[in-house]
Amino acid sequence: MERTFIMIKPDGVQRGLVGEVIGRFEAKGFTLVGLKLMSVSKELAEEHYDVHKERPFFGSLVEFICSSPVVAMVWEGDGVVASARKLIGATNPLSAEPGTIRGDFGVSVGRNLIHGSDAIETAQREISLWFNEKELSSWEPTAKTWLYE
């Protein structure tokens, strides 16, 4: 079963949107297999956003992610990576469709509430950065028979 990494960023935590975000993923039929509220070290933030290290916003992005707790999550389900990206919406909340998390709650690119892995390979890398295997629970929700053929 496919897995993805989702992080509710400091602005989402501070605005009290954790339950709303989790509810949307649950309503979509995905299974939560890892969850933790945590303060992010500068080293972890830099490693996570390594792909952006040459971009002018890298320093402020790292500083922002370290500024307040985040909620790190691993979700599981058929096609969860692509489906989660649609649920999250465009990076710029002003371009995000209504009904998406960013479209409904996002304010600006720099405060766009949530991060989601953009590919299966990226998800695997990010999950291993934020979680060890013992922190992930494999379980079978009873609703699964009502979601998948």
Curated annotation (Swiss-Prot):
- Any single biological process term in GO: UTP biosynthetic process
- One cellular component term from this protein's GO annotations in UniProt: cytoplasm
**Domain of life per record:** Bacteria
E.C. number? 2.7.4.6
Q: Which reaction does it catalyse?
A: a 2'-deoxyribonucleoside 5'-diphosphate + ATP = a 2'-deoxyribonucleoside 5'-triphosphate + ADP; a ribonucleoside 5'-diphosphate + ATP = a ribonucleoside 5'-triphosphate + ADP
What is the enzyme's class at the highest EC level?
Answer: transferase
SUPFAM superfamilies in the cross-refs:
Nucleoside diphosphate kinase, NDK
Q: Which cofactor does it need?
A: Mg(2+)
UniProt-annotated catalytic positions: 115
Q: Where is the signal peptide?
A: none
**Short name of one Pfam family:** NDK
The listed locations are: Cytoplasm
List keywords of the entry alphabetically.
ATP-binding, Cytoplasm, Kinase, Magnesium, Metal-binding, Nucleotide metabolism, Nucleotide-binding, Phosphoprotein, Transferase
HAMAP family the UniProt entry points to:
NDP_kinase (MF_00451)
**What NCBIfam families does its record include?**
PRK00668.1 (NF001908)
Q: Which family does it belong to?
A: Belongs to the NDK family.
Q: Any idea what job this protein has?
A: Major role in the synthesis of nucleoside triphosphates other than ATP. The ATP gamma phosphate is transferred to the NDP beta phosphate via a ping-pong mechanism, using a phosphorylated active-site intermediate.
Q: Which PANTHER family match?
A: NUCLEOSIDE DIPHOSPHATE KINASE
Please report the name of this protein according to its UniProt entry.
Nucleoside diphosphate kinase
Q: Gene for this protein?
A: ndk
